[in-house]
Each structure stands twice: as C-alpha cells, then as structure tokens.
From Swiss-Prot:
Disordered: annotated span: 67-86
Subunit-structure text: Homohexamer.
Record's compositionally biased regions (Basic and acidic residues): 75-86
Pfam families according to UniProt: Hfq (PF17209)
Keywords: RNA-binding, Stress response
UniProt source species: Pseudomonas putida (strain GB-1)
Family per record: Belongs to the Hfq family.
HAMAP family in UniProt: Hfq
GO biological process: regulation of DNA-templated transcription; regulation of RNA stability; regulation of translation, ncRNA-mediated
Chain ranges of the Sm domain: 9-68
CDD domains xref list: Hfq
An example Gene Ontology molecular-function term: RNA binding
GO cellular component, as recorded: cytosol
Protein name: RNA-binding protein Hfq
Length: 86
C-alpha cells in the first residue's frame, strides 16, 4: 500500500473495532450516520438500520461521536508523516 494509507487504515480500523458511532459527510454535503462495519481500499461499509456501501472518493469527512485514540506507531513509518502533511 502507498504511504497515504498509513494513517487512514489504522484510524478506520480503530473506529470499526471499537464500534464508534460516526458521521460521514460526503462531498455533495450529505451526512450519513452509523458505525463502520468494514472497509477496504475503495469503500466503507456503514451500518445503521441498514448497511450502506460508501465509496471513499465520495467521502469528505469522517467525524467520530467520541474522541478516538490511535495505536502508537511501532515500526516508525508514521513518525515523519505528521508535521508537514496538512
């Protein structure tokens, strides 16, 4: 995987494992709510009363309902990606 996934995947995985409720805002302004059931390189499965497959290219923002703590990087690959990538 490319370096762009070094933050995205652990973040989504933490939200999934902890079943954190999220609001997902799409690029067209629509707000979806639920919890992340699964995800891959291209899509996120969002579970609420139904499961929705949301394509990542349509997602603008993912907002967790509560603060989420990411696991600390153990391999050092995350260390240089934080300061200048805004």
């Amino acid at each position: 995987m490319s370096k762009g996934h070094s933050l995205q995947d652990p973040y989504l995985n933490t939200l999934r494992k902890e079943k954190v409720p999220v609001s997902i805002y799409l690029v067209n302004g629509i707000k979806l709510q639920g919890s992340i059931e699964s995800f891959d390189q291209f899509v996120v499965l969002l579970k609420n009363t139904v499961s929705q497959m949301v394509y990542k290219h349509a997602i603008s923002t993912v907002v967790p309902a509560r603060p989420v703590r990411l696991p600390s990087p153990t391999d050092g690959e995350h260390g240089d990606s934080e300061p200048g990538n805004a």
